[in-house]
């Protein structure tokens, strides 16, 4: 089953987002500008495209794994969220995680990948307690942030 995604090319000098391989979940997004990121610095980088995510879906902007592994280029708010009502240019909040070397991003470089997924639009219902709402207690309860066990060496 295929769903279409309307896309506006705001920068005709850049290719449209595309999949590197058949069956890939994400489409590559390209940088619309040259940017140099010093170690630890971040920048909001234009992609030259806007999309109309269908209602009931969400666009998620993820880092490209090769860039993150090889040079430490990632996304500050990973994944970035594109709501169905947003019609502006997709911008990617890049960050250089390398402690020493600057990263140069050139116009036309693939900088992120966009995935479009279905999302459940839940209705929020306030309750005074989970017990009162008939939601059984769980073995986890309110345990979080490491409550399920630590790493053997930490």
Swiss-Prot record:
Substrate binds at residues 64-66, 77, 81-83, 91. This is Deoxyuridine 5'-triphosphate nucleotidohydrolase. SUPFAM superfamilies: dUTPase-like. Belongs to the dUTPase family. Its cofactor is Mg(2+). The lineage of its organism: Bacteria, Bacillati, Actinomycetota, Actinomycetes, Mycobacteriales. One of its GO terms (molecular function) is dUTP diphosphatase activity. Homotrimer. The gene is dut. It catalyses: dUTP + H2O = dUMP + diphosphate + H(+). Transmembrane segments: none annotated. Its EC number is 3.6.1.23. The keyword Ribonucleoprotein does not apply. Pathway: Pyrimidine metabolism; dUMP biosynthesis; dUMP from dCTP (dUTP route): step 2/2. It is an enzyme of class 3 (hydrolase). This enzyme is involved in nucleotide metabolism: it produces dUMP, the immediate precursor of thymidine nucleotides and it decreases the intracellular concentration of dUTP so that uracil cannot be incorporated into DNA. InterPro entries: dUTPase (IPR008181), dUTPase-like (IPR029054), dUTPase-like_sf (IPR036157), dUTPase_trimeric (IPR033704). The keyword Hydrolase applies. Keywords: Hydrolase, Magnesium, Metal-binding, Nucleotide metabolism. Each trimer binds three substrate molecules. The ligands are bound between subunits, and for each substrate molecule, residues from adjacent subunits contribute to the binding interactions. GO terms for biological process: dUMP biosynthetic process; dUTP catabolic process; dUTP metabolic process. Disulfide bonds: none annotated.
